[in-house]
Amino acid sequence: MISYLDNIVFLLAKGHQRAQGVLKGHLNAFGLTPMQCLFMESLWDEDGLSVGDIGRRISLDTATLAGVLDRMVTAGWVRREADPDDGRVTRVYLTDKAKGAFSDLSASIERTNNELLSNFSLEEKLLFKRFLRDVKD
């Protein structure tokens, strides 16, 4: 039987816990959670996405995103509007607050990645990311 110390599920779970903890530490100053930051990152790539499009990009269902969206609207990070061509679709837009925080938030994400991967060579970083993408897919 494989030891839990070599069990990939255990290792991924512990790696995830550490990564989330480091990221939370960097995001505390903004009052954002890692999920909220990921939500905003999808809008930095393309502002005005529908809630469904955001969910597909970050691999979450719209029901899960509803609460995240509500909290982000309340905090002033995003605004929602009905799609002008289809009133059933809600589009989400970054506010000036979110756009103004882009540089600082990007730096926090980069610091998180650098901290987590500080013991890796460039080649190891590239391989690690590829392996994680393969496991995710």
Where are these regions (language model features)?
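N-terminal leader segment of winged-helix/HTH proteins
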Residues: 1-30, 94
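Short, locally clustered residues in the helix-turn-helix/winged-helix DNA-binding domain
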Residues: 13-16, 41-45, 106, 133
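N-terminal helix-turn-helix DNA-binding core of bacterial DNA-binding proteins
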Residues: 17-64
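Long, contiguous secondary-structure blocks with strong helical propensity
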Residues: 44-46, 54-78, 105-108, 127, ...
